[in-house]
């Protein structure tokens, strides 16, 4: 089972990928650190049927209609390789920037989990993120 990690640049996708896989891929607090997709089995998941779960770290994107080479990698992977599920990593400190991309992902018919990252920082900004939690079919506060 392939699980794509998708979201805006600098939302925490690679940090999540490293936590799931045990890898140590480069992270930074600026856009453009991840420029190609990376795949690795998720550690500590055991299935009776032997199925392997693989995390796919995708470059940041603001839209499924690409404007940059990095967005093209993300859009082409999701549209052509059809992951089994998508974890949409959303920066809780800037929710409005993520809504368009999240909406596009939900319209694809692929199961989506919205993972709010940096929610500890957002608590200082008030409760705006509670409105986002009601958005979509699946939601999961994270990190």
Regions found by a protein language model. Name each.
Residues 25, 63-64, 97, 123:
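Conserved protein kinase catalytic core
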Residues 55, 142-143:
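Conserved beta-strand scaffold positions in the cores of enzyme catalytic domains, especially
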Residues 43-47, 73-141:
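Conserved C-terminal guanine-recognition region of P-loop GTPase G domains, centered on the G4
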Residues 1-63, 81, 85:
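Conserved G1/Walker A P-loop phosphate-binding module
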Residues 63-72:
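Short glycine-rich substrate-engagement loop in P-loop NTPases that contacts/grips substrate
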Residues 11, 69, 96:
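Short alpha-helical
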């Amino acid at each position: 089972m392939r699980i794509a990690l998708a979201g805006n640049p600098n939302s925490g996708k690679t940090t999540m990928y490293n936590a799931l896989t045990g890898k140590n891929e480069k992270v930074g607090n600026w856009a453009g650190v991840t420029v190609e997709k990376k795949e690795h089995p998720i550690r500590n998941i055991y299935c009776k049927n032997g199925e392997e779960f693989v995390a796919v770290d995708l470059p940041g994107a603001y839209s499924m209609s690409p404007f940059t080479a990095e967005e093209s990698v993300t859009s082409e992977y999701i549209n052509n390789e059809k992951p089994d599920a998508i974890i949409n990593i959303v920066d809780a400190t800037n929710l409005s920037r993520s809504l368009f991309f999240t909406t596009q992902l939900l319209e694809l018919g692929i199961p989506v989990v919205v993972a709010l990252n940096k929610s500890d920082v957002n608590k200082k900004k008030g409760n705006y993120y509670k409105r986002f939690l009601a958005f979509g079919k699946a939601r999961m506060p994270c990190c």
